[in-house]
């Protein structure tokens, strides 16, 4: 049960049928992210087009056309000349107190690298979420780079949904978490999740105007403007703050309710994102006999990884993109005596998209 459903169920005390408060819609993963952002009360969306991310902006833009001005709960939607400009516009709106979404594909994050990396030091005021569409298999891209690695480099948290419902729910949560920790949050999507459809349970008023976060100063009020000026004396102080935050970000990942840890058999799988769906499809009913850790938030939840490692004799790692989780396992835990199978062992290919057939052949 999502946090929204729990909230409404508690609020009405069971007096109103849930079906009168919620509705189902068949949505692309991109549309789910867009609706999650609008329902989180964003004041703006900025982006640069690029498959597989384009529909996120287009969906918000379409909704924004009927929501009126920002001052009355509407959304400013602007395509930008490039991803760097889009990120800087979104960051400026966040500094002013508004919640803001910025969209781009994975290679677009290269263009936005300067403000992206430095925004981890300046921090944010209103919630700032970067929806990035990775393109494993290079359907319309020049490389397969994995946004999790880039975000790790910048020390910025990543949310990675495995289905359209999680894409909606986790986008809303990402804005709350961004304001809680004062950092931008990356929402990592991949092509198959961006462009596939599934039913998503939405609040009855989904897509309607919200109170403008910008007019309310959003976030935590007005921070010290020196935090936004990264001359060395300020940058050193902000860098120390960012480093001190990392253990608490790991703890937040460990208690994230979207993660799933099930300890059953001696064979286990650590998976994330759409890789979890491929595992379920490949193994079928037998999946109930497997120990499973599904990771939905980064930094990697170390204590959950330790639990499944201690429980299992053999571990499989199924992740779309780079060997991000797999490479962290050895460094985090020193997997002595445990058979670890994944991309490093050649059980899965290191290039191209995963599929249920590839997972079944492991």
Model-derived features: where do they sit?
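Thiamine diphosphate
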Residues: 2-164, 169, 192, 261-263, ...
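Flexible, low-complexity linker and terminal segments
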Residues: 2-33, 40, 161-362
